């Protein structure tokens, strides 16, 4: 199940519910993002390149195709169509859909009364391999994941924080980050 829209680079198969087909019009965007990443670019650098080269965002493409997100895009300046965020790029780089796998059970509701979503640990996810055509090879995907992991834990002084990857937000389940404000040198989490 992929929600209302297929991930960027794919379209929903009109003949088979829940199946994805490669979108020949947008697959190049995914290939470009992974190519930049495998050649050492980080998410911020990739985002900057996508904006500079005026690559359309997934939301803009959905607006153009289906008329969705009209409240965001209708009557807005053209730059909004290319306003990529680092979070979007990071999400794409971590998405196993692009190697042909479906991953389910990533999040759940806090309770039947509270519909707020929380991320589940990776060990509880369900992976179904080879459910659709891959856009990215598993080798390229693995290389990018290793680069992300190596880049994430490095500090400017070359050390790794002692609680790196261990301290999680109680509300959403994401890892907390520690840093120092560059202007006043105050630490923050």
Residue locations for each model-derived region?
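Conserved catalytic breakage-reunion loop centered on the nucleophilic residue
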Residues: 1-189
């Amino acid at each position: 199940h992929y929600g209302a829209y297929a991930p960027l680079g794919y379209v929903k198969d009109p003949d088979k519910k829940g199946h994805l087909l490669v979108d020949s019009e947008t697959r190049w965007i995914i290939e470009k993002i992974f190519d930049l990443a495998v050649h050492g670019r980080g998410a911020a650098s990739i985002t900057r390149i996508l904006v500079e080269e005026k690559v359309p965002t997934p939301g803009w493409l959905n607006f153009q195709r289906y008329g969705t997100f009209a409240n965001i895009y209708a009557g807005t300046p053209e730059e909004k169509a290319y306003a990529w965020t680092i979070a979007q790029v990071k999400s794409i780089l971590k998405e196993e859909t692009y190697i042909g796998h479906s991953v389910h059970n990533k999040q759940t509701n806090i309770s039947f009364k509270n519909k707020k979503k929380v991320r589940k640990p990776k060990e509880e996810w369900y992976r179904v391999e080879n459910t659709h055509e891959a856009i990215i090879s598993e080798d390229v995907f693995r290389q990018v994941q290793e680069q992300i992991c190596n880049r994430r834990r490095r500090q400017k002084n070359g050390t790794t924080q002692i609680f790196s990857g261990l301290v999680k937000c109680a509300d959403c389940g994401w890892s907390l980050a520690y840093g120092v404000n560059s202007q006043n040198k105050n630490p923050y989490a």
